[in-house]
Amino acid sequence: MCRKKNIGTHSTYAQNWQTFTQLIMKTAYIVRAYRTAVGKAPRGLFRFKRPDELAAETVAHLMDSIPELDKKRIDDVIVGNAMPEAEQGLNMARLISLMGLETDTVPGVTVNRYCASGLETIAMATAKIQSGMAECIIAGGSESMSYIPFGGYKPVPDYELVKNGKEDYYWGMGLTAEAVAKEYNISREDQDAFSYDSHQKALAALKSDAFKDQIVSIHIEETYLEGNTKKTRNYVVDTDEGPRADTAIDKLAKLRPVFSAGGSVTAGNASQTSDGAAMVLVMSEDMVKELGVTPIARMVSYAAAGVPPRIMGIGPVAAIPKALKQAGMKQEDIELIELNEAFASQSLAVIRTLGLNSDIINVNGGAIALGHPLGCTGAKLSVQLFDEMKKRNNKYGMVTMCVGTGQGAAGIFERL
């Protein structure tokens, strides 16, 4: 029998293997990134726009921005979606590929990690390109909460789990936000103040056209009845619908809790239900050089982590350290953060627990003001991050969020 040569301790072997893989892994670059505006659900500006159409138009715009790329060279379209059923079912990513690229040669796959789905797709695209399994991938997310409500149309819990004390596996997100507020001592006043700030930052961003270069204009044709007459109107959506100029602390304080009697979580300090799509183009270094395109960013690391489902909102507390460790970075190295504001309570709990710098978090407002289109959010926040990092000349930024059923996710990006 041939004996294997002693190559040292497990630790030494692991270090050698890591060095080896780093040497052979390819570099993946993000070369384009766009999003739609975010519409309110269920009665907002995108209420008659299917999520596959919304994403397909975003893909088409992305392709128009890079005429050097032959669409038949795209290896895959990976789309995040949190509720993949009905209009979001039937492997929506493949339909988006067919409609947006107008070719049947590019496959598509739909991915679901709830609120982190859009970020997950960027990580998947990056990993596939780094490993040599692909050269060019469109990644992103699309969600219509106007068409498919949170939880879908027919959720079916495992009642055996519920009977055995695991009912928190199926808790609504609002209940988990209440649990976080209680466990982490987040007051109603602090939640409302956080929400007010989110709206003020978002309103300032809209006033200064901060999102202008990110947003794809979406044309809507709406058919309606006026009396017995069928009419059609056309309009363009190019501005986020969520921020409210009439938001005030005293108005927020008057809102009643909606998830728990005597609770502190209200419609005013929770994220909005929303519709939207966002797409990025990820490409190998070889293809970037061949086409002569300029990359805008690269994903340095990505991590997902598990936490107790009943306090799912603290997910980033577990995910952020993992992502930093992967990248060999410290918290202080991050210059800009997009933290998804699922709820003010969980956002504050994350910020305080990790000691994050509030001055660099959600500088243009967050989901409480701008909306949270579930499976789209991770990609949307990434698009916003890249654009704002460029304006501020930042080197490293991070996108992070909590995830339903007790998870967190974080992605670190380098601006190029």
Task: Annotate each language-model stretch with its function.
Residues 24-51, 248-314, 325, 383-384, ...:
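Condensing-enzyme catalytic core mediating Claisen C-C bond formation in acyl metabolism
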Residues 35-37, 48, 52-57, 68, ...:
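N-terminal extracellular/periplasmic Venus flytrap/periplasmic-binding protein-like
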Residues 47-137, 142-160, 215-237, 310, ...:
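Conserved beta-ketoacyl condensing-enzyme motif
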Residues 49, 81-135, 168-175, 246-272, ...:
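Conserved catalytic cysteine-centered active-site region
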Residues 51-67, 92-96, 121, 173-180, ...:
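Short, well-ordered amphipathic alpha-helical segments that serve as non-catalytic structural scaffolds
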Residues 113-142, 181-210, 279-286, 351, ...:
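Active-site-proximal alpha-helical scaffold in enzymes
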Residues 214, 218, 300-369:
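Active-site pocket-lining segment
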